[in-house]
């Protein structure tokens, strides 16, 4: 379920990376892989066969089922439609069909739990908590419901009830993923027990307060984030639906909570986790990290399944960062076929060694730079919007450039070659 995105802090290999790794805070994969719940006596497979035509939900078929006056069966049909749309990355329609299912069968815990998962995935955390609590009231001893309740609480920044829900879930059913999420939440709660929390509408900032220098740094962090929030809203045409959580750690606290590799310099798992060590005032490097990590939060709000190279490329553009320092190294690797094609950089970089990771992130930045130079920020924005409709990455790329990955690889190489002349 995790993906790894990094920011090249300076130069080429041997530098520190900033990571983006969805944990319990982002449940797209969990929603996609969750087994279909039983809704009354409905046969979901049979309903799905009725409502899907040419790989699309047929609204007239749903209307026909609804006209038969059987609310629970109709709710099951809308639930089946929601799962189908979510599997095809059409998230807005998945939410819409889920809402209709709940209107028809409000006492079905499975429908509340499923809707809560979708709301977490779309960043609507307070609403997700409300739906998950409804599910838990109806079926308090369901391990799956308690798991989702924990996810909702965790994302809403409510660690104690999240821990309680996950413990309850594990008492009902052993689950390795829930155990992992619980352990992470307990580490986080232990480290942050004396943290101060401050909000400004757009951000919830948690930090170890109590010193004047930390208050000054807090104000600098808010100013930097607020400026970049406006920039990203303009550049990407959208913004997260709720406050973004930002947690400032010491170096040791950061690694205690995240258990990240030693080369990781910051992390976004739905919460921006920033280790500032002994920093007491804003530096250019810290500003770049904050801008980078906030970009990941914006991209995830638009399209949870963004190809990793695009996600990382955009984040580096927004720092802002240039590839000039290492473009010749990348060009040599491309010419000697020591660099992977971009189609192989859609998923997690977590299994790469440090040198491979730096190369992958450099390629991501170069691809984004080329697309911006050829199609403008509008082209990158249109690609995100195409992905948000459920398009596959290569189809979204074609919708902007007219070509697929093979053409993009060639164009990036030509872009680098022309730069070297």
Language model segments and positions:
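Active-site-proximal alpha-helical
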Residues: 232, 339-406, 417
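Canonical positions in the second alpha-helix
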Residues: 65-68, 100-101, 134-135, 168-169
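TPR alpha-solenoid repeat register
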Residues: 77, 111, 145, 178-179
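Register position in tetratricopeptide repeats
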Residues: 87-88, 121-122, 155-156, 188
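Juxtacatalytic substrate-recognition/specificity segment
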Residues: 194-307, 318-325, 333-339, 346-350, ...
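Short coil turns that delineate tetratricopeptide repeat
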Residues: 72, 106, 140, 173-174, ...
């Amino acid at each position: 379920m995790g993906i790894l995105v990094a920011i090249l802090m300076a130069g080429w290999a041997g530098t520190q990376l900033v990571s983006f790794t969805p944990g319990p805070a982002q449940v797209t994969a969990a929603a996609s892989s969750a087994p279909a719940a039983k809704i009354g006596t409905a046969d979901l497979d049979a309903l799905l066969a009725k409502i899907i035509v040419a790989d699309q939900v047929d609204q007239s078929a749903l209307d026909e089922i609804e006209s038969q006056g059987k609310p629970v069966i109709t709710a099951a049909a809308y639930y089946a439609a929601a799962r189908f749309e979510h599997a095809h990355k059409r998230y807005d329609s998945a939410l819409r069909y889920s809402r209709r299912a709940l209107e028809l069968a409000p006492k079905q815990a499975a429908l509340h739990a499923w809707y809560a998962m979708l709301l977490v995935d779309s960043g609507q955390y307070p609403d997700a908590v409300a739906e998950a609590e409804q599910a838990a009231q109806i079926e308090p001893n369901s391990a799956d419901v308690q798991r989702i309740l924990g996810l909702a609480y965790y994302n809403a920044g409510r660690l104690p009830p999240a821990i309680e829900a996950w413990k309850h879930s594990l008492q009902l059913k052993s689950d390795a993923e829930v155990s992992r999420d619980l352990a992470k939440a307990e580490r986080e709660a232990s480290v942050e027990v004396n943290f101060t929390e401050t909000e400004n509408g757009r951000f919830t900032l948690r930090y170890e307060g109590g010193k004047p220098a930390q208050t000054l740094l807090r104000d600098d962090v808010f100013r930097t984030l607020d400026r970049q929030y406006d920039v990203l809203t303009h550049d990407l045409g959208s913004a997260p639906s709720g406050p973004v959580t930002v947690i400032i750690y010491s170096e040791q606290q950061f690694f205690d909570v995240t258990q990240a590799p030693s080369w990781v310099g910051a992390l976004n798992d739905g919460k921006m986790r920033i280790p500032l060590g002994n920093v007491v005032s804003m530096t250019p490097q810290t500003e770049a990290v904050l801008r980078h990590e906030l970009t990941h939060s914006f991209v995830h709000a638009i399209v949870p399944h963004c190809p990793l190279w695009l996600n990382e490329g955009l984040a580096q553009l927004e720092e802002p960062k240039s590839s000039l320092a290492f473009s010749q190294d990348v060009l040599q690797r491309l010419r000697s076929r020591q660099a992977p094609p971009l189609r192989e950089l859609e998923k997690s970089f977590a299994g790469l060694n440090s040198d491979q990771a730096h190369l992958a992130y450099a390629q991501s930045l170069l691809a984004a730079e080329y697309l911006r130079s050829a199609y403008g920020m509008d082209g990158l924005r249109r690609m995100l919007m195409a992905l948000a409709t459920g398009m596959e990455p290569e189809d979204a790329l074609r919708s902007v450039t007219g070509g697929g990955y093979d053409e993009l690889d060639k164009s990036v190489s030509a872009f680098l070659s022309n730069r070297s002349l």
